[in-house]
Every structure is written in structure tokens, then in C-alpha cells.
């Protein structure tokens, strides 16, 4: 099981880092949790810089995807080239989002039959 936590520039640390910490406590050999970002490093809304584990392309093939929130979510969804890199499949992936991350799910073409639900 690969779980990708999609994290953009201006991310909210509470969303991405708590999800990473809690999910990494599951100790199964086939369990992997990754921070997925459009660049090798992203800076949070409070200046915390983290390195990405996987790309957005790799997040698109993960078994589950969690999209975190951030200060720049509206800019993210307005960036058509950036959004095109995130190819999510609601019929084959477990999708979730936190707070404004639901805007990313809604803008990524998720089916209206399976609307995003924020945490």
C-alpha cells in the first residue's frame, strides 16, 4: 500500500506532517507513506522546508492519496500545468483531502459521484 500525501508550496504543516507521522506508525512491510510534491523541496506557510519523497507523477499511481491544505491552494488549482501533472483516479485510488485540499480534488476532475470530503 502506497499512500501519497500531496504537499504544495505554502502547505499547512498540521495537514502534511501529522498525516505523515501517524500513518508511518503502521509497521507493515508493504506499507509506504510518502510526501509528494511538484518540486524537490516545498516551504510551508510558516517557513518549514521539507524534501519530497516522490513526484506528483508517482502520487498519481499511489493506492491512496491525501491532499493537504495550504495558503496557496487557490494558486495551485489555477495553475493548469501543475494540475495536469496530478492524474487521480477515484475509481482505482482511495482519495482524501484536508481543508482546502478538497479544492485540489474537485479541480482534478474527481467524479461528481464521489465528491471529496474534507477531514
Language model feature labels by segment:
Residues 1-95, 102-107, 112-113:
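Extended, subdomain-level signal for the structured scaffold at the beginning of enzyme domains
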Amino acid at each position: 500500500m502506497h499512500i501519497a500525501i500531496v504537499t504544495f508550496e505554502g502547505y499547512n504543516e498540521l495537514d502534511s506532517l501529522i498525516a505523515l507521522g501517524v500513518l508511518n506508525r503502521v509497521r507493515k512491510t508493504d506499507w509506504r507513506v510518502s510526501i509528494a510534491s511538484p518540486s524537490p523541496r516545498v516551504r510551508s506557510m510558516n517557513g518549514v522546508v521539507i524534501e519530497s519523497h516522490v513526484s506528483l507523477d508517482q502520487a498519481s499511481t499511489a493506492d491512496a492519496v491525501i491532499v493537504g491544505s495550504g495558503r496557496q491552494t487557490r494558486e495551485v488549482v489555477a495553475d493548469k500545468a501543475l494540475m495536469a501533472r496530478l492524474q487521480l483516479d477515484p475509481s482505482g485510488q482511495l482519495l482524501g483531502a484536508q481543508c482546502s485540499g478538497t479544492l485540489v480534488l474537485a479541480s482534478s476532475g474527481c467524479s461528481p459521484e464521489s465528491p471529496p470530503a474534507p477531514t
